[in-house]
UniProtKB/Swiss-Prot annotation:
The lineage of its organism: Bacteria, Pseudomonadati, Pseudomonadota, Gammaproteobacteria, Pseudomonadales. This is 4-hydroxy-3-methylbut-2-en-1-yl diphosphate synthase (flavodoxin). It comes from Pseudomonas putida (strain ATCC 47054 / DSM 6125 / CFBP 8728 / NCIMB 11950 / KT2440). The keyword 4Fe-4S applies. Binds 1 [4Fe-4S] cluster. The gene is ispG. Belongs to the IspG family.
Length: 369
């Protein structure tokens, strides 16, 4: 039953992506990106709905050409979550999705082209109240910066970002956020640190092309964890070569670990050893699968023996300590004993009961103001 995060977040300007605030005092928003063919409207809508069910706040959709832009408009009509259009090279695509109701434009001004084209995109965004994300990536730095620095560096990423920020400043446009992504953790972290000191706009965090589910999760947790612990970051996207739903889960797990957001169950579980009185790994796998639908923030401890079990269980909303018999704690107090027979079924029932009670109590507290 952990309290508020001790992290003091960097002060930033608040913008709105659809109905989701980003920056300022807003919760750190969790994003993901579809990996379907955007022209396959049904498949893309279905994937977006799965992301919504997982708790995503904002979804980015790649729009590589005009056909995809028209498909984007149809997708937008069928979903409620804010959509970001990912635009490269052709500024006319950005103009079209702006007409079709996009909630945010992700552009790399370095590959959009001449200043008049960037101005056209900015004017369209301003007229419709659409924010822009300046997306700088180590893999697509401007040629002059590549020549100047010889290779991608934190300073090169920041110089590119500030170049585009100054461009928007000249156009008197402030409704934007910025990312400076790299696949190298240290490069990305240092770039964000440098940029955070120089602008007030919200920062979109990510380790780009981080890798597969396991390696990408580790890289993202390390890199984003370092930044978030320093108060840097207003929205996050975990880039994984995996099901996009996993990006949302990992994003929330990172935020939960830092007490920056709470959604669903925060499991505390031992790695298990020969002292365990029940199969901890099997129990955890079953519980995680069964309880994915719960959205109420809840700490659940699953500890296999009495060495650390009672201490961890007393700190959780629901805790299980292995023993003969096993002992359940509710809100830090011993509640009932359980044998290994139907252990997961009984534990699931108790967790759901506690979640319902907490949801009711939280609702009453909100109603009282």
């Amino acid at each position: 039953m952990h309290g508020e995060s001790p992290i003091k977040r960097r002060e930033s300007r608040k913008i709105w992506v659809g109905n989701v605030p980003v920056g300022g005092d807003a919760p750190i928003a969790v994003q993901s990106m579809t990996n379907t063919d955007t022209n396959d409207v049904a498949a893309t809508v279905a994937q977006i709905q799965r992301l919504v069910d997982a708790g995503v706040d904002i979804v980015r959709v790649s729009v590589p050409d005009m056909d995809a832009a028209e498909a984007f408009g149809k997708i937008k009509q069928r979903v409620s979550v804010p959509l970001v259009a990912d635009i490269h090279f052709d500024y006319k695509i950005a103009l079209r999705v702006a007409e079709l109701g996009v909630d945010c434009l992700r552009i790399n001004p370095g590959n959009i082209g001449r200043e008049d084209r960037v101005r056209a995109v900015v004017d369209a965004a301003r007229d419709r109240g659409i924010p822009i994300r300046i997306g700088v990536n180590a893999g697509s730095l401007e040629k002059d910066l590549q020549k100047k620095y010889g290779e991608p560096t934190p300073a090169a990423l920041v110089e590119s970002a500030l170049r585009h920020v100054e461009h928007l400043d000249r156009l008197d446009f402030q409704d934007f956020k910025v990312s400076v992504k790299a696949s190298d953790v240290f490069m990305a972290v240092e770039a964000y640190r440098l940029l955070a000191k120089q602008i007030v706009q919200p920062l979109h965090l990510g380790i780009t092309e981080a890798g597969g589910l396991r390696s990408g999760t580790v890289k993202s947790a390390v890199g984003l964890g370092m930044l978030l612990a320093e108060g840097i970051g207003d929205t996050i996207r975990i880039s994984l070569a995996a099901d996009p739903v996993e990006e949302v889960k990992v994003g929330y797990d990172i935020l939960k670990s830092l007490h920056l957001r709470s959604r669903g169950i925060n499991f505390i579980a031992c790695p298990s050893c020969s002292r365990q009185n029940f199969d901890v790994v099997k129990t955890m796998n079953e519980l995680e699968g069964r309880l994915e639908d719960l959205l109420v923030p809840l700490d659940v401890a699953v500890i296999g023996c009495v060495v650390n079990g009672p201490g961890e269980a007393k700190e959780a909303h629901v805790g299980l300590t292995g023993g003969t018999p096993n002992l359940i704690y509710i809100d830090g107090k011993p509640a009932q004993k359980l044998t290994n027979d139907n252990l997961v079924d009984e534990l699931e029932k108790l967790i759901r009961q506690k979640a319902a009670e907490k949801a009711e109590a939280d609702a009453a507290l909100i109603a009282r103001g």
